[in-house]
Amino acid sequence: MEQAQWADRGQLLQLDTPEASAQTCCVAVSRLGSAQVSAAAFSVWVQLRGTSWVEAKEGKFRLRRGDWIALEKDSRPLLQADRHGFSVGLTLSAEALRVVSQFAECSLYAGRGHVSCRDARIVLRLWREAAKRIVAPESAMPVDVAALRPILLHLAGLQRELASRIQRCPGRSRSRKRQVFGRLQRAHLYLQGNCDRVVRISELAALTSFSSWYFSKTFHCLYDESPQAASARMRMDHAANLLKDTSMMIGEVAAASGFDNCCSFARAFRARFGESATGYRSAALSSRPDSAKATGVPRKAVTADGT
C-alpha cells in the first residue's frame, strides 16, 4: 500500500493512526486543502507555492513560499492551505526517527526556516521519489528508511546552520547535547508561534522540563539573547509583518503583538526599527513594485476631469 496522501480543493486529510502504529508517509496539501496530524509522528512541511497556516501545540505559524517548519511528535499540527497554496510534508514514526538518527550528523529538530528556490525544487523531486517508493510491507521500517533517506539527508542539510549550535549545549555526551538542543529548539519555536502575547519563562521551562534558572541560562548560551529579549524581538518582527501585509490599524497591530496600549508599542517599535509604525508602513507601501502604478491611476483621472 502506497503511503502518500494528498488533500486538495478543500479536502480535509486526517492522519490519526494510534500512537503504537504511527506510520511514516508523504503528505501534500494544496488549494484550500488541509491536513490534521493527530498521530504521534514528527512532521516536516515545506511550502512550495502560495501560503499556508499551521496551528500546533507550539502556536500558530504562517508559511510563505520557501518556508519550512518541523514539529515534534506531540504537536498535533493542522495545516491549512490558501487557494494558491501547495506544500509537501513528511510524517515520521518514532522508529523511523531512531533509525534516521543513526546516520552520522543526520538528525531533525523542531524549528522553522527558509529554503532557496533550488533547494525547494530538490525537496519536491525527492518527495515525489519517496512517495513512489514508500510501501507498508510486514517489515516496513527498512523499506521506509531506504525510501526516505535521500530527502531526510537533504532536510537535515537545510538544518545545518541550526545544528551547528549543538556544541554550545551543556552535556558530556553528544546524545545529551542533542537532547538539550532539541528541547531548546522547541522552546524557540514556541516563542515564534506565540507572538501575539507575552510568554512567561515558567511556560517555556515546563515545555522543556527544565528549571526556570537552567532554561534561561542555557537559552542565552545557545541563542546569544535571553528568552525575554527573543520574545520581544519576535513580537516586533511580527508587528512589522502585519504592518506590511495587512490593513490593520496601528492599535490592532499593537494588540495582535501582545501590547496592552499603543504608547508602549510605539516606544518598543521605534527602539527596534528606528521609526514610527506609521512611517514604517508608508515606506513599505511605497517600496512595492505596483505602488507607483496604483498611485498614478487616480492622479491621471483627476487631471482628466479638470479638478
Predicted regions and their residues:
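N-terminal regulatory/effector-sensing and dimerization cores
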Residues: 2-113, 140
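Core residues of bacterial helix-turn-helix
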Residues: 208, 257-258, 269
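Short hydrophobic/aromatic patch on the recognition helix
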Residues: 66, 215, 219, 264-265, ...
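Amphipathic alpha-helical segments enriched in hydrophobic/aromatic residues interleaved with Lys/Arg
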Residues: 2-4, 103-165, 189
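Helix-turn-helix
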Residues: 205-212, 216
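Terminal helix-turn-helix DNA-binding modules in bacterial transcription factors
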Residues: 185-193, 197-202, 221-261, 282-307
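Key DNA-contact positions within bacterial/archaeal DNA-binding proteins
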Residues: 213, 262-263, 278
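Short, Lys/Arg-enriched N-terminal segment that forms or immediately precedes the first helix
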Residues: 166-175, 217-223
